[in-house]
Amino acid sequence: MKISEVLEFKVEGEEERLDKFLARAYPDFSRSYIKKLVKEGLVYVNGEEVRKPSRKLREGERVILHVPEPEPLDVKPENIPINIIYEDEDIAVVEKPCGLVVHPSPGYTSGTLVNALLYHIKDLSSIGGVERPGIVHRLDKETAGVMVIAKNNTAHRNLVRQFQERKTEKFYKVLVKGLVKKDYGAIDTPIARHPVDRKRFWVRKEGKEALTEYWVLKRYEKYEITLLKVKIHTGRTHQIRVHFASIGHPVLGDRTYGFKSSSVPKELLSLMGECNMLIAYHLGFYHPTKGEWMVFEIEEPETFKSVYSWLEEHSP
């Protein structure tokens, strides 16, 4: 078996199973695929080979994952229900739910947004190749939100240029741990890839420019949780998650960047499920061929509504 890369991760936070930790730290791989790699002897903890996916990890331990070269993927249409908000001959706008991976990768050969798009939408751009037809931008697996899809290569190139030149408009609703003091603020700090954990990012002066604006919508003082409206001016990977973690306010549910399950009531934790409390609810862009400004918004998914309702009901 040929190895394409070797990744190292440092365990932070609460005790967790090895397979669950790696599936969260390396979201491109499904948990079942991670289990397979562990059993094949491709995972080491503190320098020792571990073949037991249920092995409990503790804070400070180091995990090394040997990633095998990917096999060619056969991406097929699948009748996965998705909400298509808008569609014309050039674009489609869809609502991606929490838990749905955007495109196939090793361990995620089916059950992705791309599989759903191939079934529901006749034509998709080919610039992204077999694995990413129509995909112009991404949302994390644990994040719900609105996405624009390109149906031809002309639209694809135009939309990619808009994202690169920051001509799009992106707003999020976010629940973070802790009481954010200022009603309005901006986080203007560069973001770089973590030198050890290559799937994570952190604030570093030598990183790429990243600007995040935020407005406080409500503070739930009893539980030390803040609801924010957030606008990102740059599109760095994990930008909102990294920026708020850097000021001591991790996104609820985001254990990769410092959220601790013990910091919220168990009842609230169960309502959150596997989702990060982060919604890409607003997307604005220029139509790639007509040039008109278009804005699309979605309502909060049921998971988020349940969390909001619980906080409202249990707050004084």
Swiss-Prot record:
Documented EC number(s): 5.4.99.-
Domain S4 RNA-binding: 16-89
GO BP of this protein: enzyme-directed rRNA pseudouridine synthesis
A molecular-function term among this protein's GO annotations: RNA binding
Catalytic activity: a uridine in RNA = a pseudouridine in RNA
Catalytic residue list: 140
Keyword entries, A-Z: Isomerase, RNA-binding
Protein family (similarity comment): Belongs to the pseudouridine synthase RluA family.
Entries under PANTHER family matching the protein: MITOCHONDRIAL RNA PSEUDOURIDINE SYNTHASE, RIBOSOMAL LARGE SUBUNIT PSEUDOURIDINE SYNTHASE D
NCBIfam families: rluA_subfam
Name this polypeptide is given: Uncharacterized RNA pseudouridine synthase aq_1758
